[in-house]
Amino acid sequence: MKEVTVDNYYDGTKMTIPLDERYDGKTNANRYYNKYQKAKNSLKVLQEQIDLTKEEINYFDRMMTLIENADYYDAMEMKEELENLGYLKKKMSKSIRKKKKHPHYQTLKTKDDVLFYVGKNNIQNDYVTFKKAKKTDYWFHVKDMPGSHVIVHSDNLDEYTIRLAAGVAAYYSKGKDSSSVPVNYTQVKTLKKPGGNKPGLVLLGHYKTIYIDPDSSVLKELEKVEER
């Protein structure tokens, strides 16, 4: 038998399937099943590669956003991160982080003496959120876009502080030239660090969202305590 005609259960039509005359019907069926499984597995591998590529694109999108507001020390930490992840070849020289006890994050202070810790790259974001911040501090970050983590060192927020912190997060983000930028905020204790991921990522628990028009004038309302 060279072929067999069967019902197509997806659209109700008839379809003709070629057969290999060297084999019986059962063997032909098994051969087609094996081809199906191979194709299915290939699609699974392809989807995994697509997902990995999307992750890489998102990662470099974050890096491109953060480098716009980076100073020399921020940029050197970003270079070190790329070396550690294998994107750049490591050079035989002492890195900035080996000379410092912690990353070079920024500390700002409001008129009410409330401190903001601002990460200017992925390494700093990880540090201020998961090491520097207390569980009762508040975390701010733009929604669904790359940007700085802003930690408010306080367990009690008023409207002024919320808008100020959200303004800093919006300004140091990919949405800095947009309007009505959504900024999520929550207490640090609700955050989790996803396992096996690159630095700078968090998993959100319960959170609130505020909409802010980014403006560099927000920085004029804050005192720069020290560059760390």
What are these regions (language model features)?
Residues 1-228:
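Extended, highly charged segments
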